[in-house]
A protein has these predicted regions:
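GIY-YIG nuclease catalytic motif and its immediate N-terminal context
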Residues: 1-37, 42-52, 62-66, 79, ...
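Short, surface-exposed polybasic/aromatic micro-patch for ligand or macromolecular engagement
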Residues: 55
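C2H2-type zinc-finger recognition helix
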Residues: 58
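A common structural junction motif
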Residues: 71-73
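Exposed acidic/Ser/Thr-rich ligand/metal-binding surfaces
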Residues: 76
Length: 100
């Protein structure tokens, strides 16, 4: 059974939040941090993992991502604050190593 994740990336000042979905959270966070893709997170320097949820079904994760993206910022902040009041980078200390 493969795990899937919905996650929030924030910039240094916590003024911008990006919501994404992935089946490999460690790799995806690494891609955001290294700006592998020149998209939203690279443009707005969203390189802190501040929140994530785990799912056993990718379809549930995608549905949750859509639900969260449709919500207002206050609701997103409440989710983050419930588990990460200081908005610390939850990936701090992770070792990033990939064979490609």
């Amino acid at each position: 059974m493969n795990k899937s994740y919905v996650y929030f990336m924030a910039n240094k000042n916590n003024t911008t939040i990006y919501i994404g979905v992935t089946s490999n959270l460690v790799k995806r966070v690494y891609e955001h941090k290294t700006k592998k893709f020149k998209g939203f997170t690279a443009k707005y320097n969203c390189n802190k993992l501040v929140y994530y949820e785990e799912f056993t079904d990718i379809n549930q994760a995608i549905a949750r991502e859509k639900q969260l993206k449709a919500g207002n910022r206050k609701r997103k902040e409440a989710l983050i604050n419930a588990v990460n009041l200081d908005w610390k980078d939850l990936s701090e200390g992770w070792l990033f190593y990939f064979d490609n």
